[in-house]
Amino acid sequence: MKGTLLIALLALASPFAHAGGDAGAGAQKSKVCAACHGADFNTPISADIPRLAGQHDDYLVRALSDYKSGARKNPVMGGQAGALSAQDIQDLAAYISGLPGKLKIIPLQRLVR
């Protein structure tokens, strides 16, 4: 029974899984991104541009893929992501997610009030 449940859970998760990227290749590809998000991905050039360092790789893959497909709208990011291959997106996510981040985490208790 446990084995069947595990197989079922893995089958459900597989559409959301991604192969992972090459952080070294992502570092090379990130130079264009750093122009707006900052060289360390913690110091964007404007307050309305997000800090990305340390962000979860699955979030970064989803966001870039959505910009590329047009599901998420932003004229700058749509153009930038449109030029990326699926492997480029994986590589960038692997690199950026591995950087030390300054993301603000909201405690769950504050969200549930």
Predicted regions, residues:
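Cleavable N-terminal signal peptides
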Residues: 6-7, 17
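N-terminal signal peptide c-region/cleavage motif recognized by signal peptidases
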Residues: 13-14
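Flexible coil segments in periplasmic/lumen-exposed cytochrome c-class electron-transfer proteins
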Residues: 20-31, 39, 72-113
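Positively charged n-region of N-terminal signal peptides that target proteins for export
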Residues: 1-4
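Short, cysteine/histidine-rich loop/knuckle motifs that typically chelate Zn2+
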Residues: 35
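Gly/Gly-Pro-rich "capping" loops immediately C-terminal to redox-active cysteine motifs
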Residues: 23, 41-69, 78-83
